[in-house]
Amino acid sequence: MPITLDQQYVISVGDTDVVSINYTDYLNSGELLTGTPTVAEVTTAALTLSNKIINTSTYTEADTGDTVAVGKAVQFAVTTSTAGAYRVRVTCGTDATLARTKVVDVLLEFK
C-alpha cells in the first residue's frame, strides 16, 4: 500500500479546489517529476478529478510556507456534490537516470 500523506484537505461540498502534492522530500537532488501524472480515486467514484499536471511554476504551500520548485509537485482539480472522506492515489514518474515511479495517497474530506 502506498504512503498516505499526513496532510488532509478539507473542502466544501460543491467547491472546485486545487490539490497540490509536494514530492520534494521524495526526490533526489536534481530529480524532477516527468510524464503525465495519474490521479485516481481509490474508494468510490464520487469525485470529479481534472487538470492533472506537474507544476510548471513555483508556488508556496499555504500550511507550511515552503516554496515548491517547478517539476516537484503534482496538481489537480477536484470537486464533488457528496459529503464524505475520500482517498485519492497520485502516481508520477521521475527523470532519474534509473527512472522511478512515486506513488502516494492523499485524504480529502468534503463537508
Model-derived segments and their meaning:
Residues 79-85:
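Surface-exposed, short loops/turns at beta-strand junctions within beta-sandwich domains
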Residues 105-111:
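Short beta-strand edge segments in extracellular beta-sheet folds
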Residues 98-104:
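Extracellular and select intracellular beta-sandwich modules with Ser/Thr-enriched
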Residues 1-31:
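Predominantly extracytoplasmic/ectodomain segments of secreted and cell-surface proteins
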